[in-house]
Curated annotation (Swiss-Prot):
Keyword Isomerase: no
Pathway named in the protein's UniProt entry: tRNA modification; tRNA-queuosine biosynthesis
Name of this protein: NADPH-dependent 7-cyano-7-deazaguanine reductase
Record-linked HAMAP family: QueF_type2
Residues holding NADPH: S92, K93, R258, G259
UniProt keyword Oxidoreductase present: yes
Subcellular location: Cytoplasm
Native organism: Dechloromonas aromatica (strain RCB)
Length: 283
C-alpha cells in the first residue's frame, strides 16, 4: 500500500475536516490523509532540507478498540511519535477515522495491531512512527502536572493583537539567563474548520532575557489565527529564534483533545530533550 499526498495548492482543504463523514468500523488505512509540512514552512523561510529544529509530534489516543481472535473487544490507550523531520503531518480527523476503523477488525494480539498502525502511519508521514499501545487491562498510568518554570498568565498586560505579531517579541538588557516560561493562554483555530484549539505552551531557552510581557502578548496574538497545532509551534519557535536570538531554544505545546486525540508538538535546537508525556490539566 502506498499513500501519497494530494497534489493541489493546499491539500488541507481537501481533507475530511469540516465535511460530513461516514464512519467505517473495519480496517481502512486509506482513510489517513497526509499533508506536506513544507506548505506552511515556506511561509517561515524553512526548508525540509535545512530545518532549524529537531523534535516530534506526540499524539495521545484515548479511544482505541479492536476485536481479539474470538471477537471480544479490547480497549487501549496509545501514543504515536511523529518525527518533526517527516515530510508530512497527518490530518487529525483522518487519524481519528483511521483509528475508528479498527473497532470491528480482528487481530490476534496487541503486537499485530501496533505493527499495523506503525506501518500505515509511517507510510502516511513518510518517516518511521513509534507506536505504543497499552491495554486498559494492564492498568496504564498517566500523570497530570505543570512545568517546572515561570507562569506568565498573571502578568497585568493590555492585549489588542489577535493575529501573530512577531514584533511583540524582544529581549531585555542584562546577562544571559536560562529559564522556562509557560502560559495556558495559547488559543488558535483549526486551519480548515475554524474550530478553537486550546493549549499550554512552554518556552525554554538560554540567552538574553526575553521580555515576559511581550512574550505573553505574542502568545495571545494567536487567538484568531488559523493554523494546525504543529504549524503554530513551528511559527512560535521561528519567531522567537529570529527576534530574540537565544543560544538554545525549545518550544512545546500541549493541546486539548478532540475526537479522542490530543497533539503535543515539540521543537528544539537540539540542546533540550523532549519532555515526558505529562498531561496538562485540560487534557
Amino acid at each position: 500500500m502506498t499513500l501519497t499526498t494530494t497534489h493541489i495548492a493546499d491539500p488541507s482543504h481537501a481533507s475530511p475536516l469540516g465535511k460530513a463523514t461516514e464512519y467505517q468500523s473495519h480496517y481502512a488505512p486509506e482513510l489517513l490523509y497526509p499533508i506536506p509540512r513544507q506548505l506552511k514552512r515556506s511561509e517561515l523561510g524553512i526548508t525540509d532540507a535545512n530545518l532549524p529544529f529537531v523534535g516530534e509530534d506526540l499524539w495521545n489516543a484515548y479511544e482505541l478498540s479492536w476485536l481479539n481472535s474470538k471477537g471480544k473487544p479490547v480497549v487501549a490507550v496509545g501514543t504515536f511519535r511523529v518525527p518533526a523531520n517527516s515530510p508530512n503531518l497527518i490530518e487529525s480527523k483522518s487519524f481519528k477515522l483511521y483509528l475508528n476503523s479498527f473497532n470491528q477488525s480482528s487481530f490476534d494480539n496487541i503486537a499485530a495491531v501496533s505493527a499495523t498502525m506503525s506501518r500505515d502511519l509511517s507510510a502516511a508521514a513518510g518517516s518511521p512512527i513509534i507506536v505504543t499501545l497499552e491495554p486498559l487491562s494492564a492498568s496504564p498510568l498517566a500523570s497530570i502536572g505543570t512545568p517546572d518554570g515561570i507562569l506568565l498568565d498573571e502578568l497585568d498586560i493590555t492585549c489588542d493583537r489577535y493575529q501573530p505579531e512577531p514584533a511583540l517579541l524582544a529581549t531585555l538588557p542584562g546577562e544571559n539567563v536560562e529559564e522556562t516560561l509557560y502560559s495556558h493562554l495559547l488559543k488558535s483555530n483549526c486551519l480548515v474548520t475554524g474550530q478553537p484549539d486550546w493549549a499550554m505552551v512552554v518556552i525554554r531557552y538560554r540567552g538574553k532575557p526575553i521580555d515576559r510581557a511581550g512574550l505573553l502578548r505574542y502568545i495571545v496574538s494567536f487567538r484568531n489565527h488559523n493554523e494546525f497545532h504543529e504549524q503554530c509551534v513551528e511559527r512560535i519557535f521561528s519567531d522567537i529564534r529570529v527576534r530574540c536570538q537565544p543560544e538554545v531554544l525549545a518550544v512545546h505545546a500541549r493541546y486539548t483533545r478532540r475526537g479522542g486525540l490530543d497533539i503535543n508538538p515539540f521543537r528544539s535546537t537540539g540542546d533540550y530533550a523532549a519532555p515526558d508525556n505529562t498531561r496538562e490539566i485540560r487534557q
